């Protein structure tokens, strides 16, 4: 029997500043540094922000999980610095980065935030989303083209989204670079989403041994 579960009220985090500006920035109509909220990320250098804001989808997904659980964390620039120090990103020259690299990411969030993570490979969404539970969400590798799923896609993978709910036929997810209606709490048929999916990602477990603080008076879950 297909497991059905959906987390409610998971905070959304854009990989830029103001989520309302995702469309303009994504489409190249707006300089990311013209968004007044960009300094809230901790960056002060415009060139560095422009470079990294295109590459921090995984950090944005992690922020959503931490904020949902009430786990304190640094600003995005400092989190990125820690991730680089732990080998999550490998900088190659002035304009190339390898990452987010899964294994060091899993080690980092375990040591830093006491979150357990398991890498999955070669698994379709219909299978892996059955792992979503009161103590588990999924960071899945998809094409950034999932922002406009009504359009044909030309690749799989290269971008991370946070899947926080699933039923027999659909997923619910946050896309850090998404545009409405496929941005926050986006709902998409699993079969449709699969064409963007690279078949890999990470299961983020905040259950036993994860040292998660209590969240009084806040519903953790809801029906799918």
What residues fall within each predicted segment?
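Conserved active-site-adjacent core of cysteine acyl-enzyme catalytic domains
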Residues: 4, 66-223
